[in-house]
């Protein structure tokens, strides 16, 4: 694994939690600027969710929810990853996603589920966030 020391290696990619709270779009831009090819994290199987959840529980300071790279760009429940990978796996918290009040189009890991399950949230909300990079 070529990941820097405080990054989590998984399936050839590296993941890191950033505690600084940002709106979803600012978080995605931060990941992209960190290094070419970086994005907010995408998930493709349950095992990844569990490994990430454990990593975040160990390293995340504070109770903030955590942005990941999934969003409903078209606002019609057609969820897309910012790294353009296939949306082949979803693990929503109960009764989610709900586009609550027609305003929630970005996806966060829910702290009350141990960061295992997802909720759609207002994109302007300030959250911690998870970047995914290749090194």
Swiss-Prot record:
Disulfide connectivity?
A: 3-14, 31-131, 38-133, 106-123
Which keywords annotate this record?
Answer: Calcium, Disulfide bond, Hemagglutinin, Lectin, Metal-binding, Secreted
Record motif Galactose-binding, residues? 96-98
Q: Where is the protein localized?
A: Secreted
Can you cite a GO biological process for this protein?
A: heterophilic cell-cell adhesion via plasma membrane cell adhesion molecules
Q: What does this protein do?
A: Galactose-binding protein which recognizes specific carbohydrate structures and agglutinates a variety of animal cells by binding to cell-surface glycoproteins and glycolipids. Is a calcium-dependent lectin. Shows high hemagglutinating activity, that is inhibited by lactose, galactose and inositol.
Protein name (database record): C-type lectin LmsL
Organism equals: Lachesis stenophrys (Central American bushmaster)
Q: What is the lineage of its organism?
A: Eukaryota, Metazoa, Chordata, Craniata, Vertebrata
């Amino acid at each position: 694994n070529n990941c820097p020391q405080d990054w989590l290696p998984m399936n050839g990619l590296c993941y890191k939690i950033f505690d600084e709270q940002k709106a979803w779009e600012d978080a995605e831009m931060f990941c992209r600027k960190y290094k070419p090819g970086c994005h907010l994290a995408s998930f493709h199987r349950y095992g990844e969710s569990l490994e990430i959840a454990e990593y975040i529980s160990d390293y995340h300071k504070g109770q903030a929810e955590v942005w990941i790279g999934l969003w409903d760009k078209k606002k019609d429940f057609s969820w897309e990853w910012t790294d353009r990978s296939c949306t082949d796996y979803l693990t929503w918290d109960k009764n989610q996603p709900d586009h609550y009040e027609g305003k929630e189009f970005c996806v966060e890991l829910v702290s009350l589920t141990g960061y295992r399950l997802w909720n759609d949230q207002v994109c302007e909300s300030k959250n911690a966030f998870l970047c995914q990079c290749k090194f």
